[in-house]
């Protein structure tokens, strides 16, 4: 929130004193991305001796904009992002490293590179979560348990036919095992058939319809239908066809 001209003079004084990194924080997480990006660009264009230092971003997530602001920063002249695994930090947290890394990877047009081994992101997230006793929310981008889980019937059918329909990231790229088809009352026949095939059951249409009717009854009574439920369902309906 500091006046740009005053901030530029402060940066010049820091460079004159030998600073090689100029960290520009949004400590309260107040800035909008276009505002933060414009501030970084102003400094890149107006600070004398800026070529001697690296502009760095340090954004907080009070309004959920830490990652967006950080990307706006490096899109306008910053060359360093201060971030944390899982976005842990004061109050609502800081910029999440895993989000920044995958944005840069998925958007080559940004002209940026991190050098981070993305296949270790999920493992590292779990390690930090364990060491800090801080649970990662299930719907956390990139590393959450539901990041690659699909429970809606339409989405499940699309992912089964072509993963890229609903996933812009291959789970293996971030060290996740695979996409997850979660069977619930919202799942369709395609999802049920897919899961049954994974378990070794290949049902013709009439048998699948019968299994699906039983599945819906089961799904209405519990939050999720797991593999053991499906084994029992197949046996109870005498639909065993294993290959």
Question: Model-derived features: where do they sit?
Answer:
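Short secondary-structure capping/turn micro-motifs that flank functional sites
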Residues: 1, 30-31, 89-90, 145, ...
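Alpha/beta enzyme core
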Residues: 1-53, 71-78
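Active-site-proximal loop/turn and secondary-structure-junction residues that shape catalytic pockets
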Residues: 1-2, 26-30, 59-65, 85-89
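Short secondary-structure transition/capping segments
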Residues: 4-7, 34-36, 92-96, 149, ...
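Predominant activation on well-ordered alpha-helical scaffold segments within soluble catalytic domains
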Residues: 8-12, 37-44, 68-75, 82, ...
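Hydrophobic faces of well-ordered beta-strands that scaffold small-molecule active sites
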Residues: 22-24, 53-59, 81-83, 100
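Flexible glycine/proline-rich, aromatic-decorated loop/lid segments
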Residues: 65-81, 88-103, 148-171
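A mid-to-C-terminal "edge-of-domain" accessory segment
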Residues: 102, 109-243
